Amino acid sequence: MQNKEQKNKRIATACYLIYRTAMRVGDEKDPDEADTVGATTLRKEHIKLTENTIEFDFLGKDGVRWTETIPAEGHDKQFHDNLKEFISNKKENEEIFDGITSRHVNAYYSSIVKDLSAKVFRTYLASSVVSKNLRDHDNIKSESDMKKLFHAKSANLDAAIMCNHKRTIPKNFEASLQTVSYTHLTLPTKA
């Protein structure tokens, strides 16, 4: 992130953003598509920098709101400083990582590990959360099936939260609700 060459600095900062937040990489959209963004398509209006924090607020994939605040300390201080530099002379509607696309980010990842992409890296981050969560429960193998299921669901929930996934109502929800209602309303017949 301290590269003197501006393009490489922007790519490295976008990659760090994905690492730090598990944000999707982002792609260009057609004008008729919803205005959702990811790392490479963030605009100045989507972040707020204070002296000590980086605040994100925007609509991500499927129109799910993404809000996150990162303290500007440790490695995040350099991240903060880079973002501050990138937005310094930009209008609210201008992209932070101008000239950088998902292709640039994926090419960078692939130069480190063959076939690595932002999507695969994000999956790795989520898997790491699940793995850590399960490792934190040393005696899970001796637990009941119900407790194992609880820990597995809890680990998956932590990964989903990190990735900003939100549950959606299933397409067949209305039909299942009616089925449940009819089942409960059916009166027993006399024998």
Annotate each PLM feature.
Residues M1-V37:
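Basic, Lys/Arg- and aromatic-enriched nucleic-acid-binding interface segment
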Residues D30-I47, V129:
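Hydrophobic/aromatic-rich, well-ordered segments within soluble, folded domains that form packed cores
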Residues T183-T189:
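Conserved small/polar residues in nucleotide/adenosyl-binding loops
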Residues K7, H75-H80, M162, P170, ...:
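Extended alpha-helical coiled-coil/alpha-solenoid scaffold regions
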Residues L59-I100, Y108:
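Basic, alpha-helical nucleic-acid-contacting "clamp/cap" segments
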Residues L42-E68:
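Conserved tyrosine-mediated DNA breakage-rejoining catalytic core shared by Y-recombinases
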